[in-house]
Amino acid sequence: MTAGIDLNDIKRRMDGAINAFKSDLASLRTGRASANILDPVMVEAYGSRVALNTVANITVPEPRMLGVSIWDKSMVGAVDRAIRESNLGLNPIVDGQNLRIPLPELNEERRKSLVKVAHGYAENSKVAIRHVRRDGMDSLKKAEKDGEIGKDDARSLSEKLQKMTDDTISDIDRLLAEKEKEIMQV
């Protein structure tokens, strides 16, 4: 911790924004099956809404198929309904206490809309990172104004903060480009 500004805390907060972005990207459905696709699905269970992975086990038995093993047989209908109503474009096939979910081929229009969603996630993450930078700059200016640090130290810390911001945003751009390539791959 330098007087007035904690660069480690700022780095931790920026890393948090990147981790949130990675998790958002993982939930986007590409051509391959991934258990993360079902992360946003909430199931009406026992009088409240819970995440699907708290009432079932999600597997990927084949590249274009998801398997959902529901622990409580009475929950099969609720899980099936939750997946169908999740706007993921998935239609589960009930097989006893399990669901099989074939992943349809993505058409060009759907691919482009997924890329737009990914760009939206990236922009939200960049905004969060800029907010962290702004908080750091405000702390820096306050410390300089209060006489805790000198002008040279303030300038040096400001440059470090800007470099951290630039590096973090370039990481987000790189992750976005990788995901975009993955989505558009036929």
Swiss-Prot record:
Primary localization: cytoplasm
Record's keyword annotation contains Protein biosynthesis: yes
Gene3D superfamilies membership: 3.30.1360.40, Ribosome-recycling factor
An example Gene Ontology biological process: cytoplasmic translational termination
One GO location term (cellular component): cytosol
GO molecular function: ribosomal large subunit binding
Localization (cell): Cytoplasm
Entry keywords, A to Z: Cytoplasm, Protein biosynthesis
Pfam families the record matches: RRF
Keyword Cytoplasm part of the UniProt annotation: yes
CDD domains per record: RRF
Protein family per UniProt: Belongs to the RRF family.
Function noted in UniProt: Responsible for the release of ribosomes from messenger RNA at the termination of protein biosynthesis. May increase the efficiency of translation by recycling ribosomes from one round of translation to another.
Name listed for the protein in its UniProt record: Ribosome-recycling factor
